[in-house]
């Protein structure tokens, strides 16, 4: 039996306005999203008109038949895309007759190349939190919010060119064999090599959470993370630099933590979950101070099937459909009224979010990518 997913009030009130996916309870001081990130988001959408409400109801429950249409859907492959296929693509195809051709190499650069060459072959693309902002307006079609239920999407996750399709968390995962039965309380323990000896895993990417978690460990409140104090973050990272083991992709992070190559790791919650539940390794998640983020759906400018793409995106973000991939992978919905399987709810980032959770300021990170990346590369090679 399924039940309606009740997201924490903090999220519905705007805690996810910084968007871009229980191992220990956390006390929750009152915090709000950072001012710079909140300011980059549009105001809440106006109530839908009667005509818009009717169009939305139709696309959610009886999307138009479109036999003969083939949509090219690009995502990231693996278990993630398999969950999207089972949760969305296959049911939508059965309802509408739309066929899907898939690409498993979603890339911002590929979107840019296709659009600028005038040879657009992708129709719907799942992108990370670093894409789909106003800075990318020349590459994307504005979304059709007469169809997409903008008022039901977490605040800040439905903007002009992108709408969040799944949520996940950047979390602290730990190998219980390596921590001697002790439970790290947050990122400060990740940086405490005396209390918790051992190697530390982290993503080899400048904007994947390495600076944010260093600042959280150093006492910066989630609401005060941006603009990032890079000097302070690097000083904190220097305290564990000799013990850091970088991972280039999610599969490697799962392998490292499961094998005990690292005692703790900065990871995506789905990979940590898989290490425990699929690989059957002694791995747990500390949800305290997770960084909540999302993936988004976009339509490249010049898509040959723009209207069909809008219908599909609208259907995936409807309350009755949005949580379907979470039956196959522990990534959560963005629709606040989403219906979720109770067997998976406890493993979702969005369910475990509270006032201690942090949020990427996507607009700030995009605007400052060059400086952040330079600081990261200089630190790593010193």
At which residue positions do the language-model features occur?
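Bacterial lipoprotein signal-peptidase II cleavage site
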Residues: 21-35
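Early extracytoplasmic/lumenal segment of secretory-pathway proteins
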Residues: 54-135
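Extracytoplasmic ligand-binding site segments that recognize negatively charged/polar headgroups
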Residues: 72-85, 120-261
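A ligand-binding cleft/hinge motif common to bilobed small-molecule-binding domains
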Residues: 131-136, 258, 264-282
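Periplasmic-binding protein-like
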Residues: 168-170, 195-207, 230-239, 278-303, 316-339
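A bilobed periplasmic-binding-protein/Venus flytrap-type ligand-binding module shared by bacterial periplasmic
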Residues: 171-178, 215-219, 293-306, 316, ...
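C-terminal capping/gating helix-and-loop segments adjacent to ligand/active sites or protein-protein/ligand interfaces
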Residues: 323-382
């Amino acid at each position: 039996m399924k039940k309606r997913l009740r997201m924490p009030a903090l999220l519905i009130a705007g805690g996810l306005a910084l968007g871009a996916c229980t191992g220990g309870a956390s006390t929750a001081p009152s915090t709000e999203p950072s001012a710079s990130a909140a300011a980059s988001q549009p105001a809440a959408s106006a109530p839908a008109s009667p005509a818009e409400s009717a169009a939305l109801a139709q696309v959610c429950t009886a999307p138009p038949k479109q036999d003969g249409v083939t949509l090219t859907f690009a995502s990231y492959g693996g278990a993630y895309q398999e969950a999207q296929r089972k949760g969305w693509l296959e049911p939508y195809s059965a309802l509408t007759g739309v066929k899907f051709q898939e690409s498993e190499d979603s890339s911002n650069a590929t979107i840019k190349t296709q659009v600028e060459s005038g040879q657009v072959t992708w129709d719907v693309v799942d992108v990370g939190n670093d894409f789909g902002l106003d800075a990318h307006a020349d590459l994307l079609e504005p979304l059709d919010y007469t169809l997409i239920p903008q008022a039901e999407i977490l605040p800040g996750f439905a903007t002009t060119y992108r709408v969040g399709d799944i949520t996940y968390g950047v979390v602290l995962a730990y190998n219980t064999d390596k921590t001697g039965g002790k439970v790290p309380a947050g990122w400060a323990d990740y940086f405490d090599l005396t209390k918790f000896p051992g190697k530390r895993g982290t993503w080899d990417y400048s904007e994947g959470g390495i600076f944010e978690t260093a600042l959280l460990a150093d006492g910066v409140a989630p609401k005060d993370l941006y603009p990032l104090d890079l000097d302070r973050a690097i000083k904190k990272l220097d305290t564990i630099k000799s013990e850091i083991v970088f991972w280039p992709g999610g599969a490697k992070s799962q392998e490292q933590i499961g094998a005990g190559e690292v005692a703790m790791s900065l990871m995506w919650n789905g990979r940590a979950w898989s290490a425990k539940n699929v690989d059957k390794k002694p791995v747990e998640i500390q949800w305290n101070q997770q960084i909540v983020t999302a993936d988004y759906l976009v339509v490249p400018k010049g898509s040959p099937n723009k209207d069909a793409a809008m219908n599909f995106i609208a259907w995936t973000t409807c309350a009755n459909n949005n949580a379907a991939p979470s039956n196959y992978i522990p990534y959560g919905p963005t629709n606040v009224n989403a219906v979720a399987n109770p067997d998976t709810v406890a493993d979702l980032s969005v369910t475990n979010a509270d006032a201690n959770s942090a949020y990427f300021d996507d607009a700030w990170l995009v605007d400052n990518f060059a400086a952040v990346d330079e600081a990261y590369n200089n630190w790593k090679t010193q």
